[in-house]
Amino acid sequence: MISCSAPGKIYLFGEHAVVYGETAIGCAIELRTRVRVELCDSIIIQSEIGQTGIDFEKHPYISAAIEKIKEIVPIEGVYLKVDSEIPVGSGLSSSAAVTIASIGALNKLFGCGLSLEEIAKMGHEIEVQVQGAASPTDTYVSTFGGVVTIPDRRKLKTPDCGIVIGDTGVFASTKELVTNVRKLRESYPHLIEPLMVVIGRISKTAEPFFQTGDYSSIGKLM
């Protein structure tokens, strides 16, 4: 059985604005999603929500990953099991982690030869397919780890300090949030577009502080 894991992610700066081309800074977290795969007579997806075949309702990201890999190599059967430490709907990029881990495991099992860049790109395509719109931040950070700027994909120095993440326990759908922001932008472009630009500028202002370790300034910008 082949195994692959990928980390979740938080936005330190630039959330939502990055969908519209503005700069964001994403950071990988220690919580991970692990996917194990092996050959099987049919396609079986096993997770905490149950067992299915290709199912775009219950397992949309995994199903899309399998379909993408099937465009490269024929897949008659595969057993794919997911174990995740990342709370779903918590803003920690659980969907990106399961997508990247699934692509990575299938890539190894079927010898597709995909590079990390190609895995990240495929993961982003899947998130766009499932969510309607998505930034490449989640899948890129989940693939490469560390602290990364998007869209220019520059690695920043990882902060030598702890970051506290609070889990409210309240579920929120990324797809719904992205859709709501898009509708708001379409209804009030004169208000929302300048806000997106300012959010991007805050991200750019924060970049050099990661390199110098100026955590006080990073905190103030947050």
PLM region spans:
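C-terminal nucleotide
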Residues: 1-7, 11, 18, 34-74, ...
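Active-site nucleophile and cofactor-binding loops and adjacent substrate-binding regions
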Residues: 93-94, 135, 141
